[in-house]
C-alpha cells in the first residue's frame, strides 16, 4: 500500500517534466532562429526615379527581408502606373558611392514575358459576316504621357489564327491619343456555308518601320510565344439582323435600322401588323427635320393594301401623310394579312448634315384611325436616327490606368484617372468625343466620375474598394462601359516601431540642456551637469506606417481580395508622415516623420489623424523609461562600392524587388572606404547609426599601421577613410564610439563600444595561446590627443579625426591628463560600469533550459518531503520511539468483577516475561487518570507497572473498563538478531482463563480455539 502511494505522484510529475522539457527545447529553437534573423541591413538609400506612383511593400513580420544582412539590403516596390514615356530608374546610394539601373519591363500573361509597353487591346466586333469580313481591334497605351514626336511609339501587329490559315495586319500608335486601330480582313474561304467558326486573335509589339503606315510588312509565321492574347471572334455564315423594333400602339410595330446612316444613304423603315388588326383604314403621320425626307411609301402586299403619300414642307419640319386602305373583301370572313410586314417607308439622307460630326435627327411617328378620340391623336412616338459622315462602329473609353489605389482617406487629396472617349469607324479611323457626353458610376461608394466625364476619381468619402467596378458612358445612341479596380485601405494603420521602449543609454551624454526630469542625482552633480550643458541620450527608433489594401466583392460578400496578397502591407510613410505626431511631445518627438526621439520618462503614443474628419487612423503606444542600457558593441561593415540587382515579381505586374550589396574586396591604394555602423544594445535591440544625430556621435578609427588610413572628406563620405595601402592579408580597422567631445569628461572618455572591420579577407581563426588573466579588458588600440596633435598609445596604430561618416571626433588626450581630469570631474559610478558582453539568444535558451530542469528537480524534491511528512503524521503517538512497531490495541473489559480485574493486573505486573518477550503494558482509566507500564527483561516490575484499583463508594455496579496495551520498548541488552531475520514484537501472554475477556471481541469463545490461538502467539514470540 505504501509503495503504491509513493509511486502515485510519478505519473503526473513525469508528464509535467516532459512538458517542461518540450517547452525548454522550443525556447532553444526559437532562440536559435532569432539569433540568425537579426533585423539588420545595409542602410543604403533606395529610390525610384521617373515613377509617378509607387509604394514600398513588405510582408507581415518580414522586415527587413530574410535575405538582408549587414552587407546587403533588399526592398520590394510596387509601381501602380505604367510608364510609356521612359523606363523608370532605381537609384541606390551610400555616399560617396551610387549606382542605378533601369527597371525591367512589366511581366504580362500568359507567358510571363516582360514587355516594354503596357498596352490595352479592345476588340470592337464580336462577330463578322461575309458582308462585313473585318475584325477591328483598338490598341491603347496606358500610363503617363509620351513625347509628341512619332519616333518613339511602336507598332501593334494583329495576328488572326483560323483552321483555314493565318492573317495579320499592323497599325502605328498615334501620338495624340496613344492609340491605333487594326482593321483585319478575313479571307472568304474562312467563312462556312452553314456553321459558325472561330478565329483567335493575338498581337505583338514591334519597332516602327519604313513600311506603309510606319510599320514593317511582317511575316506569315505564327506568333507563337511572343504574341499576347486579345480574344476570339466568331465568323457567321450570314448577316445577323441589325435593326430595332419599337411599338407604335398595341397592334402596329415599327422596325428601323440600328446603325448610323451616312449622307446620301437610303434606308427603309418597316411597319408590322399583328393578326388581330381589323381596321380597314390607317393614317400614318411622319414629321422629320431638314436633312431627311420621306421618298416613298410601298405596301408589302398590294393586293390587300394601298398606300398614298402626301408631303408638306415647313420652315423647320417636313410632314408626310401616308393613308393606307384595305382592298380585300370586307365582312366577318375577312382576316388580317398573314404576313407581318404591310408597309415600307423609304428615307433619304441629304448631304452635309453634320459637318463630319455625328448628329441625330428625330423622326416623329403618329397613327390615326377613323373616329378616334382627339386625346388619342396626341400619342406620338419619336425615333432618333444617328447621322454621321463616318461609319461609326463603337464608342470606347480610354483610361490611363485600370486600377487605382485609394489613398485619399489617408492624405485628403483626391486620386484621379483621366478618361478620354473615342469613336471607331469602319475604316479604322479614331475620333475623340468631347461634347454631349453622359456618364454614371455604377457604385459611388467605390468610385465616382466627374461631371465632364473626363475622369474617374476617389475623394476620400468612399467606404469600399472593388474589382471590376463599372462606369457607363454614352454619346448619342452609342454606349460603352469602363471597368476598373479600386484598392481601399483597411484601417487602422499599422505603426511599426523598431523599439517600443526607449531607455537611457549608459554613459552617453549629448550637448544641450536637460529636457524634463533627469535621473536622480546629487544636487552638486546636477548643477555641474547643467552648467556644462549636457544631457542624457535616450534610444531612438525608426517609424514606419503600413496598411493593407483590399477590394471588396461587388455582391456584398465578406471575402476580400488583397493587393499582392493577404500578408502584404504597403508603406505609406511618405503620405501620412505630415499627419503623424506624438500625443505628448514632452516624452518623445518625431523627427522628419521617420525617427522617434525619446525626451523624458513617460508613456505616450504615436497617432495619425485623418485630414478629412480629424478621426484617428492609427495609434501605437510607446514608453520612455529611465532604465539604463549599454551599447554592447558596434557592428561595422566596410563599403568600397555598391552593386544593384533588380527583378520582377509574380504577384503583381508592377512588383519590383531591388537587392543591393556592399563591395568589400581588397581595396586599391587611395581608395575611399565608407563604414556602415549598427549599435547593439544590452536590451537586445539594434539600431543603425543613421538614427542618431551625426553631431551626437563621437567615432574614432584606428589601424595597426599608422599610415594605412587617413580621414575622408566630410562632404563625400558620411563615415569613411581613405586607404593608402593594404597588404594581401587584409587590414583590420577598429572603430570606437564615444560621447561627443563637449560631453567627454572624466570617465566618460572610456569608449561606449567598439567594433572591428576587415578590409579584405579576414584571417582564419586560430587557437589563442594561454595568457595570464588581466584585471580588466581594454581596447586593443587606445587613442589620445595632446593640444590637437594626434597620437596612438604605445605606437600601436593610426587613427582618423572626428565625425560620423566623415567627421571624426577628436582623439583622447594623454593618459596622465585623463586621470587628472577624472579625479577632478568624477561622474556617477553607475554610469561608468563597463558594458557587459552581449549574451546571445542561444545562451539565453540554454540558461532557460537549465533553470527549468532545476525547477523541475526542486518541485520533485518538495513533493517527496511533503509526501513523507504526510505519512508520518498518520503514526500513533505511542510509536514515536519505534516507528516500525505495530499500532497498539485498545481492549475493552466487559466484566463486573472489579477484584478479578485487579488480580489479573497484579499478576501481570508481578510475573516476569521470558527472555525475548516484551511486557504487557496495562492501562485503565477512571476519572480521567491514566498510567502506562512497559516492563522488559532487564527492568524491575515496580518501575514499569501501574496498577489501577477502583473501589466504588456506592456498592458493586457493572462497569466498562478500557485498557490499553502499549508496545514494549526494546531491551537494553537484547542479543542481536541475525541479518535478514523478521522483526517480531514480543507481547505478554497469560493463561487461557486470564485472557478470555481479552479475546471475546475476536469471536474465539471455544476453549480449543483459544488454546490454538495462544499457541500460535507463543510460537510467534
From Swiss-Prot:
Q: Region Binds to HSPA5/GRP78: which residues?
A: 606-913
Write out the tissue specificity statement of the associated record.
Expressed in the brain in neuronal cells of the hypothalamus, thalamus, cerebral cortex, amygdala, and cerebellum.
Which residue spans belong to the Cytoplasmic compartment? 870-1021
GO BP, sorted A to Z: cellular response to hydrogen peroxide; negative regulation of programmed cell death; negative regulation of protein catabolic process; positive regulation of Wnt protein secretion; positive regulation of Wnt signaling pathway
Which segments show compositional bias classed as Basic and acidic residues?
A: 806-820
Question: Which subcellular locations apply to this protein?
Answer: Golgi apparatus membrane; Endoplasmic reticulum membrane
Source species taxonomy: Eukaryota, Metazoa, Chordata, Craniata, Vertebrata
Q: Which gene encodes it?
A: Tmem132a
- Write down the glycosylated positions: 276
Region ranges (Confers cellular localization similar to full-length form): 666-1021
**Which family does the similarity line name?**
Belongs to the TMEM132 family.
One Gene Ontology CC term in the entry: Golgi membrane
Q: Which Pfam families match?
A: Ig_TMEM132_2nd, Ig_TMEM132_4th, Ig_TMEM132_5th, Ig_TMEM132_6th, TMEM132_3rd, TMEM132_C, TMEM132_N
Q: Where is the composition biased (Polar residues)?
A: 929-948
The name on file for this protein is Transmembrane protein 132A
Please list the residue ranges that the record places on the Extracellular side of the membrane. Answer: 33-848
Amino acid at each position: 500500500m505504501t509503495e503504491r502511494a509513493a509511486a502515485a505522484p510519478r505519473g503526473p510529475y513525469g508528464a509535467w517534466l516532459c512538458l517542461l522539457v518540450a517547452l525548454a527545447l522550443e525556447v532553444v529553437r526559437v532562440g536559435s532562429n532569432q539569433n540568425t534573423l537579426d533585423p539588420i541591413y545595409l542602410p543604403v538609400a533606395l529610390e525610384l526615379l521617373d515613377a509617378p506612383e509607387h509604394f514600398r511593400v513588405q510582408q507581415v513580420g518580414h522586415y527587413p527581408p530574410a535575405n538582408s544582412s549587414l552587407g546587403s539590403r533588399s526592398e520590394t516596390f510596387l509601381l501602380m502606373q505604367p510608364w510609356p514615356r521612359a523606363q523608370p530608374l532605381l537609384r541606390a546610394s551610400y555616399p560617396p558611392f551610387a549606382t542605378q539601373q533601369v527597371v525591367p519591363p512589366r511581366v504580362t500573361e500568359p507567358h510571363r514575358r516582360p514587355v516594354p509597353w503596357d498596352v490595352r487591346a479592345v476588340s470592337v466586333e464580336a462577330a463578322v459576316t461575309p458582308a462585313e469580313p473585318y475584325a477591328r481591334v483598338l490598341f491603347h497605351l496606358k500610363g503617363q504621357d509620351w513625347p509628341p514626336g512619332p519616333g518613339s511609339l511602336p507598332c501593334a501587329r494583329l495576328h488572326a489564327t483560323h483552321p483555314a490559315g493565318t492573317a495579320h495586319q499592323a497599325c502605328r500608335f498615334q501620338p495624340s491619343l496613344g492609340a491605333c486601330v487594326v482593321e483585319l480582313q478575313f479571307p472568304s474561304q474562312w467563312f462556312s456555308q452553314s456553321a459558325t467558326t472561330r478565329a483567335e486573335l493575338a498581337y505583338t509589339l514591334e519597332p516602327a518601320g519604313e513600311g506603309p503606315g510606319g510599320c514593317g510588312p511582317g511575316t506569315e509565321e505564327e506568333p507563337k510565344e511572343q504574341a499576347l492574347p486579345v480574344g476570339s471572334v466568331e465568323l457567321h455564315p450570314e448577316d445577323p439582323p441589325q435593326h430595332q423594333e419599337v411599338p407604335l400602339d398595341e397592334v402596329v410595330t415599327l422596325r428601323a435600322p440600328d446603325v448610323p446612316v451616312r449622307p446620301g444613304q437610303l434606308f427603309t423603315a418597316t411597319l408590322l401588323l399583328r393578326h388581330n388588326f381589323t381596321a380597314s383604314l390607317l393614317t400614318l403621320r411622319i414629321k422629320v427635320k431638314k436633312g431627311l425626307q420621306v421618298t416613298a411609301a410601298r405596301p408589302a402586299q398590294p393586293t390587300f393594301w394601298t398606300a398614298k403619300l402626301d408631303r408638306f414642307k415647313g420652315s423647320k419640319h417636313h410632314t408626310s401623310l401616308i393613308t393606307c386602305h384595305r382592298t380585300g373583301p370586307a365582312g366577318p370572313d375577312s382576316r388580317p394579312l398573314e404576313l407581318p410586314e404591310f408597309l415600307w417607308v423609304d428615307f433619304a439622307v441629304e448631304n452635309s448634315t453634320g459637318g463630319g460630326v455625328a448628329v441625330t435627327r428625330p423622326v416623329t411617328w403618329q397613327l390615326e384611325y377613323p373616329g378616334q378620340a382627339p386625346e388619342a391623336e396626341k400619342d406620338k412616338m419619336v425615333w432618333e436616327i444617328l447621322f454621321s459622315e463616318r461609319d461609326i462602329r463603337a464608342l470606347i473609353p480610354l483610361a490611363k490606368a485600370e486600377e487605382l489605389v485609394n489613398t485619399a482617406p489617408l492624405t485628403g487629396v483626391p486620386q484621379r484617372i483621366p478618361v478620354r472617349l473615342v469613336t471607331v469607324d469602319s475604316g479604322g479611323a479614331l475620333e475623340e468625343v468631347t461634347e454631349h457626353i453622359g456618364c454614371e458610376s455604377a457604385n459611388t461608394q467605390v468610385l465616382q466620375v466627374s461631371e465632364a466625364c473626363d475622369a474617374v476619381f476617389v475623394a476620400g468619402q468612399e467606404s469600399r474598394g472593388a474589382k471590376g467596378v463599372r462606369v457607363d458612358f454614352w454619346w448619342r445612341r452609342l454606349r460603352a462601359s469602363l471597368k476598373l479596380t479600386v484598392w481601399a485601405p483597411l484601417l487602422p494603420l499599422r505603426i511599426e516601431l523598431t523599439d517600443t521602449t526607449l531607455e537611457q543609454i549608459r554613459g552617453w551624454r549629448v550637448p544641450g540642456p536637460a529636457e524634463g526630469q533627469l535621473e536622480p542625482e546629487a544636487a552638486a552633480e546636477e548643477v555641474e551637469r547643467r552648467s556644462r550643458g549636457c544631457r542624457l541620450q535616450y534610444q531612438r527608433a525608426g517609424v514606419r506606417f503600413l496598411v493593407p489594401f483590399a477590394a471588396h466583392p461587388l455582391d456584398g460578400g465578406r471575402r476580400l481580395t488583397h493587393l499582392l496578397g493577404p500578408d502584404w502591407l504597403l508603406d505609406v510613410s511618405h503620405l501620412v508622415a505630415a499627419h503623424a505626431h506624438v500625443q505628448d511631445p514632452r516624452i518623445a518627438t518625431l523627427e522628419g516623420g521617420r525617427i522617434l526621439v525619446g525626451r523624458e520618462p513617460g508613456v505616450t503614443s504615436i497617432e495619425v489623424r485623418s485630414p478629412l474628419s480629424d478621426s484617428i487612423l492609427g495609434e501605437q503606444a510607446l514608453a520612455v523609461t529611465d532604465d539604463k542600457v549599454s551599447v554592447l558593441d558596434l557592428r561595422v561593415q566596410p563599403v568600397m562600392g555598391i552593386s544593384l540587382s533588380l527583378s520582377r515579381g509574380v504577384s503583381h505586374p508592377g512588383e519590383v524587388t531591388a537587392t543591393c550589396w556592399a563591395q568589400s574586396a581588397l581595396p586599391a591604394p587611395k581608395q575611399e572606404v565608407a563604414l556602415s555602423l549598427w549599435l547593439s544594445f544590452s536590451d537586445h535591440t539594434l539600431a543603425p547609426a543613421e538614427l542618431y544625430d551625426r553631431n551626437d556621435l563621437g567615432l574614432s578609427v584606428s589601424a595597426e599601421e599608422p599610415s594605412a588610413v587617413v580621414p575622408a572628406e566630410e562632404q563625400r563620405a558620411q563615415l569613411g577613410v581613405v586607404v593608402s595601402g593594404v597588404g594581401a592579408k587584409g587590414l583590420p580597422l577598429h572603430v570606437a564610439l564615444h560621447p561627443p567631445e563637449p560631453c567627454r569628461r572624466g570617465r566618460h572618455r572610456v569608449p561606449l563600444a567598439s567594433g572591428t572591420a576587415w578590409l579584405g579577407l579576414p584571417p582564419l581563426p586560430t587557437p589563442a595561446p594561454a595568457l595570464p588573466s588581466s584585471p580588466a579588458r581594454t581596447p586593443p588600440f587606445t587613442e589620445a590627443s595632446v593640444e590637437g596633435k594626434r597620437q596612438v598609445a604605445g605606437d600601436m596604430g593610426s587613427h582618423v579625426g572626428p565625425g560620423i561618416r566623415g567627421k571624426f571626433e577628436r582623439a583622447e588626450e594623454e593618459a596622465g591628463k585623463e586621470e587628472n581630469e577624472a579625479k577632478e570631474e568624477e561622474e556617477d559610478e553607475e554610469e561608468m560600469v563597463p558594458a557587459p558582453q552581449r549574451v546571445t539568444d542561444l545562451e539565453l535558451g540554454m540558461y532557460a533550459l537549465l533553470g527549468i530542469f532545476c525547477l523541475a528537480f526542486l518541485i520533485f524534491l518538495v513533493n517527496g518531503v511533503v509526501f513523507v511528512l504526510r505519512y508520518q503524521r498518520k503514526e500513533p503517538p505511542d510509536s514515536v520511539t519505534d516507528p516500525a512497531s505495530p499500532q497498539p490495541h485498545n481492549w475493552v473489559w466487559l466484566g463486573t468483577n472489579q477484584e478479578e480485574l485487579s488480580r489479573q493486573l497484579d499478576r501481570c505486573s508481578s510475573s516476569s516475561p521470558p527472555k525475548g518477550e516484551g511486557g504487557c503494558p496495562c492501562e485503565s482509566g477512571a476519572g480521567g487518570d491514566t498510567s502506562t507500564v512497559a516492563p522488559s527483561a532487564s527492568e524491575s516490575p515496580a518501575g514499569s507497572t501501574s496498577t489501577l484499583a477502583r473501589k466504588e463508594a456506592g456498592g458493586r455496579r457493572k462497569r466498562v473498563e478500557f485498557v490499553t496495551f502499549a508496545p514494549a520498548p526494546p531491551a537494553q541488552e537484547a542479543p542481536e538478531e541475525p541479518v535478514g531475520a523478521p522483526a517480531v514484537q514480543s507481547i505478554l501472554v497469560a493463561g487461557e482463563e486470564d485472557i478470555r475477556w481479552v479475546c471475546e471481541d475476536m469471536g474465539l469463545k471455544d476453549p480449543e480455539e483459544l488454546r490454538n490461538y495462544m499457541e500460535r502467539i507463543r510460537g510467534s514470540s
